[in-house]
């Protein structure tokens, strides 16, 4: 247990994790309570040591294609919830093919096909399966799907047509908070979908939000909850209030920062993929997240893309700086580099 550990003893924490130590709940309370700059820097350093032990200076790159921003859900935190009166789009199959052409040879390890729970695809799930097949045939890369809570039959068909990874975020394992965030949606349904996907050979990603009313105990509950389906990727994202949503005016005063939780995730899941998203703070934010222990850059947009991200800190900026060339340039400055495709597929194992 590390609850009484002095600051200088944090330096050995990474070594303990590499040797097989598993954090206790009291350990998690100690780490999540850290506030001093020195304490946090030592936590980040321990997380980097663990990451570097398993992955070296290699980083994975994930292209994000948000192909439909229509959604039937009323998530209180999400800009794209069905009650928000915003401009939306749904790419045609031809537009998706054209997007794929811009990605060939660009250096991405995986393509993330994301949509809201769009009635167009939910009324005829074979449309979604066809989309997966087209992208697989065009690019031949591993495909992550983020379609919301699809039925098992559709998940199985998508797997057969080339989907490798299912991203389906719980947001929180605090059931009371969940009801406030994913309004009217089944808690168990999402857990069961990930479990089914894992059984069918998918890799799975789970994720939580922070800064949305979670405290240390509910965060521990969520961290433990993410372990239940043996996820291949674990994510935390900071809640960013979105215009036109029920939580537009919400402000959280906790000290449970995304960077702190990324480091804790690395210590809990030493061999897993942990994202450094561009969605909240762009390239500069990517650097901070990699320095906290992340090892895959997500929300990289296709070249010259006008597609949306999820939180879109840069929605109104002319220069979005979220392309793969910009990412690679910054990685090189950091002394890091894109991994080989074979490295990524070895990590996937699925």
Curated annotation (Swiss-Prot):
Binding-site residues, [4Fe-4S] cluster: 71, 75, 78
Domain Radical SAM core: 57-279
Recorded superkingdom: Archaea
GO biological process, one term: pyrrolysine biosynthetic process
PROSITE patterns (UniProt xref): RADICAL_SAM (PS51918)
Residues engaged in binding S-adenosyl-L-methionine: 77, 171, 182, 190, 240, 242
GO molecular function, one term: metal ion binding
Top-tier EC class: isomerase
Pathways involved: Amino-acid biosynthesis; L-pyrrolysine biosynthesis
Name the record gives this protein: 3-methylornithine synthase
Gene: pylB
């Amino acid at each position: 247990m590390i609850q009484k550990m002095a600051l200088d003893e944090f330096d050995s924490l990474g070594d303990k994790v590499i040797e097989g130590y598993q954090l206790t709940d009291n350990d998690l309370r100690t780490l999540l309570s850290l506030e001093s700059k020195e304490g946090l820097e030592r936590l980040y350093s321990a997380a980097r040591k663990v990451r570097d032990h398993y992955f070296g200076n290699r980083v994975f790159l994930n292209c994000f294609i948000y192909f439909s921003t229509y959604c039937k859900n009323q998530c209180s935190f999400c800009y794209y919830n069905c009650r928000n009166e915003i401009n939306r789009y749904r790419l045609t199959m031809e537009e998706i093919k054209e997007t794929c052409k811009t990605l060939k040879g660009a250096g991405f390890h995986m393509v993330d096909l994301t949509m809201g729970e769009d009635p167009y695809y939910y009324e005829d799930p074979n449309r979604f399966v066809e989309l997966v097949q087209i992208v697989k045939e065009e690019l031949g890369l591993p495909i992550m799907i983020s379609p919301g809570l699809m039925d098992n039959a559709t998940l199985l068909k998508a797997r057969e047509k080339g989907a490798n990874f299912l991203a389906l975020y719980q947001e929180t394992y605090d059931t009371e908070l969940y009801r406030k965030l994913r309004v009217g949606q089944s808690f168990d349904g999402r857990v069961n979908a990930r479990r089914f996907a894992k059984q069918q050979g998918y890799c799975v990603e789970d994720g939580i939000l922070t800064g949305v009313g979670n405290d240390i105990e509910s965060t521990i509950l969520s961290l433990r909850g993410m372990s239940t389906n043996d996820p291949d990727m674990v994510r935390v994202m900071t809640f960013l209030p979105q215009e036109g949503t029920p939580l537009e005016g919400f402000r959280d005063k906790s000290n449970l920062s995304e960077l702190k939780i990324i480091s804790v995730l690395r210590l809990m899941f030493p061999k897993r993929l942990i994202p450094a998203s561009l969605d909240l703070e762009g390239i500069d934010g990517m650097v901070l997240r990699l320095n906290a222990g992340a090892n895959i850059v997500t929300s990289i947009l296709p070249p010259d893309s006008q597609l949306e991200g999820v939180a879109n800190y840069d929605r109104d900026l002319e220069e979005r700086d979220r392309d793969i060339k910009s990412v690679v340039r910054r990685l090189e400055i950091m002394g890091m580099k894109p991994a080989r495709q074979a490295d990524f597929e070895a990590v996937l194992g699925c």
